[in-house]
Amino acid sequence: MATPTVATRLQRRVACISADDALGATLEAALPEGWAITRVTDIAALGDFADILQYRFLILDLDADAFDPLDVIDTLRREMMLNIAILCIGGDPAQRDAARLARADRFFERDAAVGVLQQFCGQYEW
């Protein structure tokens, strides 16, 4: 990505890190007007530090088998030292506890994903 500008920072974008195509398609269809979603299974596909900061928040699928969600959180928090909101979807209590210790922000059931997306899009609408 080119050097971030004020215009690119004001774009309303969210990243969904999940291998679940149905979840990604559902979230994409539920996006409010003016928002865009980037769906990936590898955090590196979002780019570097400055690229990831262009997203308002991230939705992370804790039920993923294609990647380790804890590695994603570790990369964002420890390696990149980013303080972007990480909203976790799914996962059992042990997965959620591990993600909480890794410094993920919020946790929701899979069936609440659309409502969570719309709620946070409203909060990050600036």
What label would you give each PLM region?
Residues 31-34, 82, 101-104:
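Short, structured coil segments at secondary-structure junctions
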Residues 52-53, 76-82:
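Conserved phosphotransfer cores of two-component systems
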Residues 34-42:
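Short hydrophobic/Thr-rich beta-strand motif most characteristic of the beta2 strand and flanking loop
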Residues 56-77:
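Conserved phosphotransfer microenvironments
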Residues 1-29, 117-126:
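Non-catalytic signal-transmission and effector/linker regions of two-component phosphorelay proteins
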Residues 41-57:
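Acidic, metal-coordinating helix/loop segments flanking the phosphotransfer/catalytic sites
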Residues 83-93:
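A short, hydrophobic beta-strand element within the central beta-sheet of small alpha/beta folds
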Residues 93, 100-120:
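Output/docking surface of receiver
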